[in-house]
Amino acid sequence: MIVLALTHLPPPQTTHNDGPARPLLEILRQPVFVVAALTGLIGYGVMNLAMTATPLAMHRAGFDFDHVATTIQWHVLAMFVPSFFTGYLTARVGARSMIVLGCLLLAGCGALAQLSATLHGYYAALILLGLGWNFTFLPATGLLTETYRASEKARAQAANEFLVFSTVGMTALLAGPLEASLGWAGLNAVLLPLALVPIIALLWQRLANGVNSPQIRH
């Protein structure tokens, strides 16, 4: 409450009529929308699947509850503390560069899981996982704003959130069975290449639209 009281928020801007809204399918087929939505669902999905499986894997490996709780605490800090400067970094280097960095951090979590199953290995992997989520999901959300006009905002954001959080729900349900059948290292071996898919999508977008994709004027 104190932070809210001391924070100056600009007054809401009046939305100007920018013409009729395009069909939803036309919005979804834009390369920039594909990249933004794919990055969001991959970043959130990979993070949620690994995070949800972590307590199960650590319990199976013989770690006690305190170790599991501390691991998740470090992970949550890595998810949200960078938010204080993620926007600044995104403005400086661009959303696409931040997405690449986030994907590499997510892949780093998957790689580290193959190398170390020690307590500190779990700490490091979950910290990388949290940072990777922050550096993919937040820039992807910003990138999404390049894909719609003011009159299309609600539908475009609703479609994106449906895709992202449907993935989150599925990964939460799949975490237990996948960890039980594949193990911690095997699960992360599957997640590692998935974490790199947004980078491939960015390369595809670059070929489709050029380096500087045209932005929608609001």
Where on the chain are the PLM-derived regions?
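C-terminal membrane-cytosol helix-exit motif in multi-pass small-molecule transporters
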Residues: 1-14, 201-206
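Juxtamembrane intracellular "pre-TM" segments in multi-pass secondary transporters
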Residues: 8-36
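Short amphipathic helix-loop junctions that connect adjacent transmembrane helices
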Residues: 52-71
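A late C-terminal transmembrane helix in Major Facilitator Superfamily
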Residues: 152-181
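Intracellular juxtamembrane helix-capping segments at the cytosolic ends
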Residues: 135-148
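Helix-to-loop junctions at the C-terminal end of transmembrane segments
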Residues: 81-95, 179
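C-terminal ends and interior cores of transmembrane alpha-helices
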Residues: 105-117
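Pair of pore-lining "gating" transmembrane helices in MFS-fold secondary transporters
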Residues: 29-50, 127
